[in-house]
From Swiss-Prot:
The organism of origin for this protein: Thermobifida fusca (strain YX)
Gene that produces this protein: rpmC
UniProt name for this protein: Large ribosomal subunit protein uL29
Cellular component, GO, one term: cytosolic large ribosomal subunit
PANTHER family: 60S RIBOSOMAL PROTEIN L35/50S RIBOSOMAL PROTEIN L29, LARGE RIBOSOMAL SUBUNIT PROTEIN UL29C
NCBIfam families named among the record's database cross-references: L29
Length: 85
């Protein structure tokens, strides 16, 4: 992941896309930790950034699960159903 995503940007994704982004972020964190352990990591701050991205993704998924903040992809599907009726 080249750039950090904000929670507002993440809310625009579907649950499937969020789980895919979560998987990618976890893989990146694993690789960064491995590089840090072997002394090959150049940018230590990237570890912190990736951890925060993972936390943001979990937060958005939990908001959706609790119904606090629906995902944008879901809102557009609901509006389409209402318009069809």
């Amino acid at each position: 992941m080249a750039k950090s995503l904000t929670a507002a940007e993440l809310r625009g994704y579907s649950v499937k896309e969020l789980t895919e982004k979560l998987k990618e972020a976890k893989e990146e964190l694993f690789n960064l930790r491995f590089q840090a352990a072997t002394g090959q990591l150049d940018n230590n701050s990237r570890l912190r950034i990736v951890k925060r991205e993972i936390a943001r993704i979990y937060t958005v998924l939990r908001e959706h699960e609790l119904g606090i903040m629906p995902l944008a992809a879901e809102e557009s599907a609901d509006k389409a159903k209402e318009a069809a009726e």
